[in-house]
Amino acid sequence: MPSNMNNKLDPVFSSGFVRREFNDSGIADGKLRTISTSSCATTMSSESYRISLGVGPLWWSDVPVHHRTDHDRASLLTGYSRKSSVDSAGGSLYEASSRASSLSSSQSDCSDLESQPDIHSLCSDDDCQEVLRQILQHDQPVQITIKLHVTEDQYTNWNTILNPVNNLLYVALPKDLPPAGSKQTFISLLEFAEEKLEVDGIVMVMPKDQPDRARLIEAFLFMGFEPLSRKAPQAPPAAINDNENYYFLYSIEE
């Protein structure tokens, strides 16, 4: 499980923080928009990604796909998509979270992703590393929808922005979290952010009307998250006027 400690991280987003609109598949379409800090301007990457991950500590294994156990199969990154444009028509990333979140009774994530025209199937460690290389090569904030499987048939979509300027991952907590496996799913997200994206911290945003809010906050604090002031440098400056969300910071030890 990821470790935590206090790090000093730089401010990034302004009141022009972005929102993503999703179509039925959960993949973003649309326009490019500029976001900024008080001292500099940062442009969102024109590309966005959607990746599929499973619950478990082993993200990629050298065991052949068709010979995996259920646990190994769930841990495999089996597909991703990349879009050449993103929709940031207004509002904030967090407002789009509940619309992006979903539970599905689809087939396995490989076949589900392959139903989209711009999907790439991943069946080797080299493929997985190439996806990470493409994501990490961006020097501008890039939007990533992380499809986290609770089982092979149920998943939630997590709307995130990876900001290389301050090396933070901004995550909007989905409104509808499955009761079964939600803790392990969340731990999987933390492990992916720390071990694969190698971020310095995670800023989690929770709507104040989040179902089962008290239990989730208790779980966050237990895992090492700390309440984050809306005026803190790690929070997007748009948070100063945001009365609808709670902010939490998870700092990752180097």
Curated annotation (Swiss-Prot):
Q: Coiled-coil ranges per the record?
A: none
Return the Gene3D superfamilies for the record: 3.40.630.60
What's the gene? Oda
Recorded hits in InterPro entries, A to Z, give:
Acyl_CoA_acyltransferase, ODC_AZ, ODC_AZ_sf
Under Pfam families, the record lists: ODC_AZ
Complex and partners? Interacts with ODC1 and thereby sterically blocks ODC homodimerization.
**GO terms, molecular function:** ornithine decarboxylase inhibitor activity
What are the record keywords, sorted?
Developmental protein
Protein name as annotated: Ornithine decarboxylase antizyme
